[in-house]
Amino acid sequence: YEQRAALAQRSQGGADLGRCLRDGGGAWQDSKPLFDILNTWQTSVQLREHAMSTDFIAHLRAELDGLRAAGLYKAERVITTPQGATVKTADGREVINLCANNYLGLSAHPRVIEAAHEALRSHGYGMSSVRFICGTQDLHKTLEARVARFVGCEDAILYAAAFDANGGLFEPLLGEQDAVISDELNHASIIDGIRLCKASRWRYRHNDMADLERCLQEADAKGARFKLVFTDGVFSMDGTIAQLDAMRALCDRHDALLGIDECHASGFMGRTGRGTHEHRGVFGKVDVITGTFGKALGGASGGFTAARREVVELLRQRSRPYLFSNTLMPAIAGASIAVLDLLEASTALRDKLADNTRWFRHAIGAAGFEIKPGEHPIVPIMVYDAVKAQQLAARLLELGVYVVGFFFPVVAKGQARIRVQMSAVHERRHLETAVAAFAQAGRELGLVK
């Protein structure tokens, strides 16, 4: 009664209700006044809750209006087909798709789809459990072993999302006595994961080895117990490739661990598609590798971390996204095994992607556009002005080419661009049509002559 009375007195009409609840006899003798008071109190609480809800909704609307006014609102276009060289939009138009992470064209590959169907038939739709209770099937263990072999590590652990792989990495491994050193342009999942750990933090200028060494020297001077340098293997907005060979040398000099996120590299970077570490000649010499099944490796969802067996074992015990998230669905596990079968059997898809990338980079430059130099299938076409980037993307869609403009806060102010992504599923006719559309739209908007 005392607790109820105290709660009631915080609301309008609470004094009367409080007296009734404290009264062991009199107020309960006549129930009508009590129920009148209860009704009044309940109504006042409901009104207060409604007012709070209205204020909150008004706040959210103001936030959304601000995003629209600043040109930062991200609209979602609906497509009605699988990912491919072309897709159909909700209005039924078929457009050339230049903005998917479907680097190898495997998201709709017949063998991958059949493997997913077979896993559904043999292992079910979902596990309704986390891994350590009853959510581990033979498919999951097989995939972990295959991933570890593919990227050149002893063991691997699966996550429901690649974001979780990075989000659950740093806190279990690093403590207050340690240091983590991160590239300034690392992915949001790396940044968020680092924020969750207690290690001292350094951030070095993008791909700048001199500044990385400065950070390592400062961590040494502070007496850091363990040091972990972590970088994207490939940076998603620029397509720049981390200098892992130089980074490995620096880490060896300063007795530091090296970790990479391979989301935009696994499956196609390097001679056999093993990733950035193969591309840079340090395959088997990277301590921790995170990656995704949501891009080149099938395009669905899910992520992984690969490392020494002791690292993976500790993550199984302490990585919160792994411990408290449902298991990767069997169909994704089965399909991902089929993806690795394809990639280990042949480099044909990787080779075609490289050919498409070389051709498009040359052709779009010849059309008068400025692009970020490089060799990655991410091709940033620089527009610089955010409004112009949105106008260019909209006009290209009208011309039958689906791309997206990127601008602040996704990239720095004044660095707006169209990010084009090549795929092995593109044929030359798709790329020729796309370059012609870029040239037409660019002339109309005064971006090229």
PLM regions and their residue ranges:
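Hydrophobic, low-acid, alpha-helix-prone terminal segments
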Residues: 7-21, 34
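N-terminal "arm"/small-domain region of PLP-dependent enzymes with the aminotransferase-like
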Residues: 56-125, 256
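Conserved N-terminal alpha-helix of the aminotransferase class I/II PLP-enzyme fold
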Residues: 114, 118-162
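Active-site C-terminal subdomain of aminotransferase-like
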Residues: 254-257, 264, 269-375, 388
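PLP-dependent enzyme catalytic core of the Aspartate aminotransferase-like
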Residues: 42, 46-49, 54, 110, ...
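Conserved PLP-binding catalytic core of the aspartate aminotransferase-like
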Residues: 351-400, 410, 414-415, 422-424
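Conserved PLP-anchoring active-site segment centered on the Schiff-base-forming lysine
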Residues: 169-188
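Active-site phosphate-binding strand-loop segment of PLP-dependent enzymes
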Residues: 102, 202, 206-260, 423
